[in-house]
Amino acid sequence: MCIRDSCNTHSSFKDPVRMSNLCQEITLPTEPIDHIDDEMGEIALCILSAINVGRLNKLDDLEELCDLSVRGLEELIDYQKYPVAAAESATKTRRSLGIGFIGLAHYLARQGVAYDDPNAWQLVHNLTEAFQYYLLKASNQIAKEKGACGNFSRTKYADGILPIDTYKKDVDDIVPNNLNYDWDTLRDDIKEFGLRHSTLSAQMPSESSSVVSNATNGIEPPRDYLSIKKSKKGPLKQIVPSYGSLKNNYTLLWEMKGNKGYINVVAVMQKFFDQAISGNWSYNPADYPDNDVPVSVMAQDLLTTYKYGWKTSYYQNTNDMKSDEIEEPTNISKPTDVECLLAELETAEEDCEACAI
C-alpha cells in the first residue's frame, strides 16, 4: 500500500511521486514511455545497500560505513548496464540511492530493549538520525569532489529542506524532537555544494542480504530463534545472532501483543528516511476471541500508520501456527536435536576473534 500524501509531503523531490515498487521501499518520480528507446520517460530503479546495525559498537561508526556505502553505489550507477534508455537517463541524472538497515532486532537485543519499550523508540531515533546525517554528509562530500547530480535542482534539498523539516510532527509524541547532530551546518553545505544523490535512504525487506550476513531481517523482529528459509538452493537454517548471550533479550514477532511498538519504530525511522520503509503489520489470531482478528484492529493500525507518516506498507502477516519443520536428511531436523543445538550455543563462547571481525 502506498500513501501518496506522505510520499509527496515528506519527499526529497519537487516532482510528484505516484507509486512505489513491489517491496514498497522505493518512492521515486516516474514518467511513462512511448517506446523502448524513449529517453523522455523515467523508470525508477532500486539502487540498494544495507548496513548491519546489529554489529555497531557506537553510532559514530556509521560515518565510515555510510561513506563506503554511498561511494560504492555511486560507482555502481555508472558501471552497470541499462537495457532501457528511460531507466539509464533517470538513474544517472537523479542518482537516487536507497540504503537501509539489517540486524535491527539484534541491535535492540544488544541494548536490552524490546520493540514495545519506549527506550527502544529513542534508541532507533538516535540510530536513524546518525544514519541519515552521515549519508547526507557523504553525498555532500562527493558533490564537492564530482559536482551535484544533474537533477539536484529538482529536489527539496536544493532549497535547504531536509527530512527533519517535513516529517509528520505527530512522531514527536513518540520521541521528543531532540537532535544530536549539527544539521544547520550540513544544511548550509548542501545548499552551497549540493548532493551527488537525490535520495540516500530506503528500508528494504533484505531477506537475502540478512542471510549472507547472518543478521536478523532488516528491521523485523525474528519469528523464532531458529528459522528455516527456503530458496532455489534448498532450505537454510538460521539462528539469531549471539543466541547464547542474547536469547532472553530478543523480541519474537508472535510474542508481541499488537503492532504499536513496531509501528512506532517505523515511524521514528521514517522521520529521517527520504524514501520509504517496507513496513509490515502482524496479527496473531490466538490473541483474539475465537481466533478472529477484528477488522477494527486492522483499521486502527492503518489509521495510526497514516497519522505517524508511514509512506508505504508491505505485508499483513498472520500467524498460521505452522512450524518451519521440513523433511530433509539433516542432523538437526528433529525438535529434540534443535533444542540440543540451541542449548549448546547458549553455553558457547561467542567472543572469539573470528566472530569479532
Each language-model region and where it sits:
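Active-site loops and adjacent core secondary-structure elements that bind or stabilize anionic groups
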Residues: 1-2, 207
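Internal maturation/activation junctions in enzymes
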Residues: 66-88, 114-206, 278
